[in-house]
A protein has these predicted regions:
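Short linear regulatory motifs enriched in tryptophan with gly/pro/ser
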Residues: 1-175
């Protein structure tokens, strides 16, 4: 029987006014690239934009993981590693907080808090354990664009309702 260790993490979209979060178990031996794909799936993102992952220690970036060597040029004063070559197990449980930022234009910050380790995990894939709230659609304009979007979607008499509803459907967004 397959047994491994899992990391139990809670991932919140960093919103001021809403709770959007997922609790997930992930195998201990995954890379930060794998974590990126897991978060994309959990929040219904389409992997259309750049991203990075920071390990945070005492509210400072300890290490930043990026997609490619070209991305390293933007952060010359930090410890930068390639996410595809870096395993989570090398950093957890020493560090308890990560920040996953997706789409630098909309700036979706996901706060990843490490809750605990599960020693008898019997899967080689991630499992969503719990969650709350709908994820925003791609390219909605960040947090405040999402609030505007929700106001329009809730008001069928709004002049932009039909257009916004059609756009939401094209983004596979659901209420």
């Amino acid at each position: 029987v397959f047994k491994t260790t899992a990391i139990i993490m809670k991932i919140h979209l960093n919103f001021e006014k809403m709770n959007v979060w997922r609790k997930v178990a992930v195998p201990f031996n995954i890379t930060f690239s794998d974590l990126h794909r897991i978060i994309q799936y959990l929040f219904s993102w389409k992997n259309c934009h750049m991203h990075d992952i920071e390990i945070v220690d005492n509210d400072k970036t300890a290490v930043r993981f990026v997609i490619s060597e070209e991305d390293m040029e933007y952060y010359s004063d930090e410890s930068i590693l390639l996410e595809s070559q870096s395993k989570i197990a090398d950093y957890i449980p020493k560090y308890k907080k990560l920040i996953y930022t997706y789409d630098f234009g909309d700036n979706w910050q996901h706060i990843v808090e490490i809750e605990n380790l599960q020693l008898d995990y019997d899967k080689n894939y991630a499992v969503c354990l719990d969650g709350e709230g709908n994820s925003p659609p791609e390219d909605v304009g960040g947090e405040y664009g999402y609030y505007d979007f929700l106001d329009i979607i809730k008001n069928p008499s709004h002049e932009e309702y039909k257009e916004t509803k059609a756009w939401a459907s094209s983004q596979y967004w659901h209420e």
